[in-house]
Amino acid sequence: MKTWPAPTAPTPVRATVTVPGSKSQTNRALVLAALAAAQGRGASTISGALRSRDTELMLDALQTLGLRVDGVGSELTVSGRIEPGPGARVDCGLAGTVLRFVPPLAALGSVPVTFDGDQQARGRPIAPLLDALRELGVAVDGTGLPFRVRGNGSLAGGTVAIDASASSQFVSGLLLSAASFTDGLTVQHTGSSLPSAPHIAMTAAMLRQAGVDIDDSTPNRWQVRPGPVAARRWDIEPDLTNAVAFLSAAVVSGGTVRITGWPRVSVQPADHILAILRQLNAVVIHADSSLEVRGPTGYDGFDVDLRAVGELTPSVAALAALASPGSVSRLSGIAHLRGHETDRLAALSTEINRLGGTCRETPDGLVITATPLRPGIWRAYADHRMAMAGAIIGLRVAGVEVDDIAATTKTLPEFPRLWAEMVGPGQGWGYPQPRSGQRARRATGQGSGG
């Protein structure tokens, strides 16, 4: 496999970047659109949808279940019924949203559906969700990939207890389909911790937008009443988690990066993202439907609890590795990342140390002491976030090469081009020189890849 030479930024990065739609919001909208169609409420449209491997896997899954998805690029329409054909088989790839959102949907059908995925996906946690479906009366063969869901055309619902300590997607997957259960659903989280709670809040917010009656007023308990899921138009926000990699370029280079279309009010964890950037002395400015981040002249190590936003960990770890030499950063609340696309804690520790850094694992996180890094190969482990972290480190460390930049197709197929355009020509990529007088580069992703 050919390595990708990460562009360096010897001067402050100054760029405007347009990132495609949110993967998390796109795949939730697709599931809700499928449920509305299955209830006979009509077709839903999704505008600004992300087109990446994860969302293509979701589109394929819905079509496997018998639904119809029309449209090109980022404009999609979902219609039809849940009527899987004989031998229906869903490929989850490495997509946690497909792995955990689609089985409850398949349980509403009347034909067995087999689920499988990439070899690496077979280590991702799924047993608590399958056990919950069994508790609700669904016949499920298997305890992990591959497994089979044997629906009988309806699902009574009721009350279920589940330990979602390994993934908040267990809760979201149940809640998304719950309004179509005969008696609705009450979900009680029984674990000691709940990672990525903002993503459950996103699920609840989108359910309300679809007219679903959901009560999440009691901590660790959610109740969805049976009823209609409205067909509607879904407008997808830019993917703010993907945007963090680009904003990190402003932080590590002391430059200025503007993200277009940044929402004033978001179903994504925008407040958590901005709080971390400010903790690193970045200046954050909302203006003209965009977000501008001005990086500091330098920053020291930092302590941050990433329990709510574990997806940011690789980017934040890269920032920690590039802090003032000798300063220490402590990243906590992220033990659950050991069950993500790869064991992200082990992967980050290994790769930072291989480049001469100092990183060690703790029971629930990482401790990183910033030390001068050297050139070398940064391994992505087929993980999109790991690949992006390598790109961030490469901004400051000449000679870093990412072994699998194609891993970014999972959520941002155009990442290499957007990154190169942001950093600018002459840094290892043959892009045209900016026009005379052009002050800031613009990198635009249309989300049509994958």
Swiss-Prot record:
Cellular component annotations (GO), alphabetically ordered: cytosol; plasma membrane
Region listing for Disordered, in residue ranges: 426-450
HAMAP family according to UniProt: EPSP_synth
Superkingdom of this protein's organism: Bacteria
Record: residues binding 3-phosphoshikimate: 24, 28, 167-169, 196, 311, 340
Keywords from the UniProt entry: Amino-acid biosynthesis, Aromatic amino acid biosynthesis, Cytoplasm, Transferase
Protein location: Cytoplasm
Function according to Swiss-Prot or TrEMBL: Catalyzes the transfer of the enolpyruvyl moiety of phosphoenolpyruvate (PEP) to the 5-hydroxyl of shikimate-3-phosphate (S3P) to produce enolpyruvyl shikimate-3-phosphate and inorganic phosphate.
GO biological process: amino acid biosynthetic process; aromatic amino acid family biosynthetic process; chorismate biosynthetic process
Catalysed reactions, as listed in the record: 3-phosphoshikimate + phosphoenolpyruvate = 5-O-(1-carboxyvinyl)-3-phosphoshikimate + phosphate
GO molecular function: 3-phosphoshikimate 1-carboxyvinyltransferase activity
Family recorded in the similarity comment: Belongs to the EPSP synthase family.
Assembly: Monomer.
Protein name: 3-phosphoshikimate 1-carboxyvinyltransferase
Residue ranges crossing the lipid bilayer per the database entry: none
Keyword Cytoplasm belongs to the record: yes
Pathway named in the protein's UniProt entry: Metabolic intermediate biosynthesis; chorismate biosynthesis; chorismate from D-erythrose 4-phosphate and phosphoenolpyruvate: step 6/7
Ligand binding (phosphoenolpyruvate): 23, 96, 124, 169, 344, 385, 410
Gene that encodes the chain: aroA
